[in-house]
Amino acid sequence: MKRTFQPSVLKRKRNHGFRARMATKNGRAVIARRRAKGRARLSA
């Protein structure tokens, strides 16, 4: 049985990257929450 996590930098960036987050209203909300919390890394 193959493992479920098959890493790919491209897919990671496209789905969870900063630009992907900023593309939608909810994504921007995610960034705002993480900024408010003081996260060192805001996105993948």
Curated annotation (Swiss-Prot):
Any single GO BP term: translation
Family: Belongs to the bacterial ribosomal protein bL34 family.
PANTHER family in alphabetical order: LARGE RIBOSOMAL SUBUNIT PROTEIN BL34M, MITOCHONDRIAL RIBOSOMAL PROTEIN 34 FAMILY MEMBER
Protein name according to UniProt: Large ribosomal subunit protein bL34
UniProt keyword list: Ribonucleoprotein, Ribosomal protein
Short name of one Pfam family: Ribosomal_L34
HAMAP family for this protein: Ribosomal_bL34
Signal peptide: none
Disulphide bonds in the chain: none
GO molecular function: structural constituent of ribosome
One GO CC term, this protein: ribosome
